[in-house]
A protein has these predicted regions:
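Short amphipathic alpha-helices and their capping/turn residues within compact interaction modules
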Residues: 122, 126, 139, 152, ...
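Active-site-proximal specificity loops/subdomain of glycosyltransferases
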Residues: 112, 137-195
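Acidic, Ser/Thr-rich intrinsically disordered and amphipathic helical segments
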Residues: 44, 83, 98, 112-116, ...
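Juxtamembrane luminal stem/stalk of type II transmembrane Golgi/ER carbohydrate-processing enzymes
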Residues: 1-114, 119, 126-132, 149-153, ...
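Beta-strand elements of modular eukaryotic interaction domains
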Residues: 86-90, 125-126, 134-135, 190, ...
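Short coil/turn segments at secondary-structure boundaries
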Residues: 113-116, 135, 148-152, 159-162, ...
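Catalytic core and acceptor-binding pocket of nucleotide-sugar-dependent glycosyltransferases
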Residues: 4, 43-47, 247-315
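GT-A fold catalytic core of metal-dependent nucleotide-sugar glycosyltransferases
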Residues: 2, 180-254
Length: 315
């Protein structure tokens, strides 16, 4: 009887199984979900790897991608707001330093001293690499046109001036045209600092025999050549020559140039050029107050007409 009951029970179960569809067990469900998740993970990973070859930012999570798309403008270089800023950006070294030479029609005439200035960069020791960082700052149209046809192209900038007649010709020392040219140059240099660019200003009648940058003092705001050097680079008793000046852009130098340019009108005799005014204000309490750090360059290395270097090996 036991065998019969067992057979009946088994037969009955088989019949039910044949009539009713079996439901998957919990273990089977987990296996299916695991396969689906694995397939999805592999597919997404392949897509990310493929896209990252063209855009590495695609490996970021969706919310980070969304944040980046909303803020991507902060990662783009800022477009220049003016023609001057465009020229500065194109000519600047990695540390935002430019070399500036002021030009007018007389300075850039064919076979002029300016041609020798450019040639000195080619033949000087370690100087040719700096030619691409030189900006010809022109005060009249003819100087600008000639600048564009020389090695400086495209780093030429035309100052917006309404008095070309006084600025473009041969201006003898201390004539009204000379003084106007000097102070127009000073205002331009102040503007360069305000835009955040360091500069090395060089008169166009200076010949670059060697790379001057190793001679500059580190961590100094303002460095200037001397007509007469007393042997102490920190002494304000040195008599300066503003035709070769290295300045780093910061709040101290911007304030100093504003003070320097504004001081032209502080004195009864306004027929003063920038060097005379500098020598009058260099001990002013305001200069100490802003904390600008100055150094005066040895004429052994940076020679001038008043005190030419006696060492041809080092000048």
């Amino acid at each position: 009887m036991k065998n019969t009951s067992s057979e009946l029970s088994s037969s009955s179960t088989d019949d039910r199984d044949g009539d009713i569809t079996k439901l998957p067990s919990n273990g089977s469900q987990r296996d299916v979900m695991t396969l689906v998740l694995l397939f999805t993970t592999v597919t997404v990973s392949c897509i990310l790897v493929y896209n990252s070859s063209n855009n590495p930012l695609m490996v970021l999570s969706p919310w980070k991608l969304n944040w980046f798309s909303q803020n991507k403008t902060s990662f783009k270089p800022r477009e220049p707001a003016s023609e001057l800023e465009r020229v500065l950006m194109n000519a600047a070294m990695e540390d935002k330093t430019v070399i500036i030479a002021a030009l007018n029609e007389a300075w850039v005439a064919p076979n002029s001293i300016f041609d020798l200035f450019l040639e000195s960069f080619h033949v000087g020791i370690g100087t040719e690499k700096y030619l691409k960082h030189v900006i010809g700052v022109c005060v009249d149209d003819k100087a600008y046109e000639r600048c564009l046809h020389l090695h400086l192209h495209p780093h030429c900038y035309l100052i917006n001036a309404t008095d070309y007649d006084q600025l473009s010709g041969k201006n003898n020392y201390m004539t009204p045209g000379y003084l106007k040219l000097i102070w127009r140059r000073m205002e331009f240099l102040r503007e360069v600092l305000a835009l955040g660019y360091n500069f090395l200003f060089t008169d166009a009648d200076i010949l670059w025999f060697r790379d001057p940058f190793p001679r500059f003092f580190p961590d100094v705001d303002f460095q200037i050549a001397c007509d007469h050097y007393n042997g102490n680079s920190s002494s304000k008793r040195n008599w300066v020559n503003s035709g070769f000046t290295y300045v780093k852009a910061n709040n101290k130098t911007i304030k100093f140039y504003e003070f320097w340019c504004g001081s032209r009108y502080r004195f009864h005799d306004r027929r003063k050029h920038d060097q005379e005014v500098f020598n009058l204000i260099k001990r002013d309490p305001f200069v100490d107050q802003i904390g600008i750090k100055m150094r005066f360059l040895d004429t052994l290395h940076i020679g001038t007409f008043c005190e030419p270097s006696k060492d041809v090996i080092n000048v």
